[in-house]
């Protein structure tokens, strides 16, 4: 186990464009740019590229991500001349470089000579060249060639004045996280030996007494390849853990070379915290990096903006609320969804600034210039096929100006909320395995629904990995926390006994770290803390539902119900099943936990939600639980749900990001502070605040820097206000908070 890497942001580059000129690198500012692929274009286009980059305010590009075949056209030949030229050209124009190690996709000569590097699927099929990322994470042959390239890149460019960071590979695991080859099998066995030491321990953990699976030699152990029936569930879970670790070990191998050759250059790689990308435990990977980077693409649907905010928030949690790098997102449509929807006016800036609101200090896109050929030619870029005379490029230039205005935000951290949602990769992986009570359960969707409910109520909530210290939070929501080892159970119990308020849901606490059921009734490890007992699950068929009455409202539960028995006198039933097989039984409960006496008395609680309410049904449930915990919205009642509030702080100032989630103007009353971006309403109308604090289009400029009054958020608009830092309120005891 490696120790966490200390946080380091972009290296300050060498001398170049004078500070303050458009496009100049400003160490204290937010970075702006894209993946840049000059090798796709004739040399004369490069000069136009840097001209347009300076016009847009680009300060950083990621370079050479898919350039292995260009850099090393054959096993024994190298061509760095074009890359030298590109690095020098960018540096001459004040544009810094996050330089990729170029190992993302092996060149054809390598896979032709060494087909043994190609991944294999669960059914034994080979993933052939012709796309990208066709390599086994555990292949010693691939690693030998890739690390040779990394060393050459580090030696050649480590001292280049444009270099500000190393970019390891690209989206590790996007297409090759699960490899079932013989290389993977050997590495899996080595990983299992390290984890369990003995076969007896492995047999016990995997429960191999079932179905005559007991192993008598390590060579008998295989990845969960295609089998006659459901593979062993703990074998599946361990293979997911191993696969994530194998990629992490590969990341570490590249990083070790880079740090040995160029110890002053920070190292990162781009995560993919978004949607159902779940094969990589990024909370564990973060310790390998100097700073976290992430790629995110909007997923169309009714929760598209919620999901964007959720993913940005979780990325901040993975980064321990330190600044992180948005390495990729899109200016408009992508190319890989069933229907690739173009962004509407205002969405380019709103989406980008939502990431900044949750801690991003760099905003970058895939890619700079939209490709003319290849699989991603219909994926938008900063310069579209239509060229610079397009609405999209004008929006790109406008966002660059806004990011320059937001320079004071750079280096600030996410201000802790009073509530948090716990996110756990083991529970995600395990709760969705086969041979379960239902295959309709979706872990991330349940977590997202709770986040949507927080947004609807206008209450800030952090999204944090399960290993996070929860002591600073008043309310912690842990949806479908399926895997609860004894240590996590004890942490949650201590949180509640210290006055915290825990909320968890159906199918939580059911198994330990080996996916073995906690015996004695559900919810297993959390049964005593919650003060309830469930004898068996009662999942619902498609089309079935159960009505629950809570606080006078009739709510619909789907997917899952449970016959909940209250076994502790301190449990209050907040919601009752009114229809279905569970009619008359408890559906939502809360146990009050009192510890200590006198001035040291604490009163916490542990609540349980036994059905799936969905994002809308959770709003009244969460409202009741937050009210009882004394957690309130910081937003005016009139804009809750329409506006998201995210807060960053540098200890002296807080930065309020107010995001208009609607397609209409929204007025936010009584917001004091300096307006860094957005519009303030004055007595004579709307004022557009510029970087020097004056207001355009009104006779009442300048606007007072610390003035109150209303903000007008344009449709899909974002305002940023700098205010004196407010102290984080201490946890409130509900006995005095009501």
Regions found by a protein language model. Give the residues of each.
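The substrate-binding groove and active-site-proximal loops of carbohydrate-active enzymes
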Residues: 31-41, 64-81, 128-147, 172-176, ...
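Short, acidic/polar
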Residues: 40-55, 146-152, 274-285, 344-352
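Conserved, mostly hydrophobic/aromatic
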Residues: 34, 53, 61, 90, ...
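N-terminal carbohydrate-binding accessory modules
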Residues: 1-62, 73, 88-92, 96, ...
